[in-house]
Structures are given as C-alpha cells and as structure tokens.
C-alpha cells in the first residue's frame, strides 16, 4: 500500500458502505501501524472544487465511473478494513488532492 493507491474500504459511521478510497498518509509511515489515513470517494459529484477532487475513470486508477475524492472527510481506519487495491491516482490527480487537503486542514491559509 502506498500514497495515492485507490483501495476499497469499509469505514464505520455515516459513510460505512464499502467504497473506493485513496491512501493519503505518507509512505514514510510504518507499514506495521494499525491504522491508515484515507479519503473516501463518491460517485455523487458536487460543485466543490476546493475540497472535492474529481477523477475520471482510467485503466490506471481502476474506477468505473467519474468520482470525487472527499478531501473534506479524511478518516483513519483500521488496516484490516482495507480491501483490495483497485488502482493508483496519476500524478496530476495526486497534486490536486494535495492542494485540496492543504485547503481543508488550513495549510493553504
């Protein structure tokens, strides 16, 4: 697992249905750590470019439909709740996700 991977997750709470998510924690984080920071994805796209990153499906990312990374809803989940790897975001999508995450947590102020 590495940053930018698109995986399936089953997180708890309001967004608990299995869905694609992007690994957003650094690759420098120990692989033995019990949890992983992800941003879940949704196919219900909204007009919120500051914190929702729209990603079109490609063979590389493994998505089936246009989706948005919900940078406004990062979650930490137990490693065992991560399912299979679907694909990986391209460099442009990762760069846009970085900007959105910086906006959400106030690093862009």
Label the model's feature ranges.
Residues 1-109:
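Conserved functional hotspots at enzyme active or ligand-binding sites that engage polyanionic ligands
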């Amino acid at each position: 697992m590495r940053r930018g991977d698109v995986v399936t997750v089953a997180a708890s709470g309001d967004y608990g249905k299995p869905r694609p998510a992007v690994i957003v924690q650094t690759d420098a984080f120990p692989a033995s750590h019990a949890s992983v920071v992800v941003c879940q994805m949704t196919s219900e796209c909204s007009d919120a470019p500051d914190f929702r990153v729209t990603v079109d499906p490609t063979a590389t990312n493994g998505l089936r439909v246009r989706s948005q990374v919900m940078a406004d809803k990062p979650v930490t989940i137990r490693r065992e709740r991560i399912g299979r790897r679907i694909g990986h975001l391209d460099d442009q999508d990762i760069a846009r996700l970085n900007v959105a995450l910086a906006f959400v947590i106030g690093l862009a102020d």
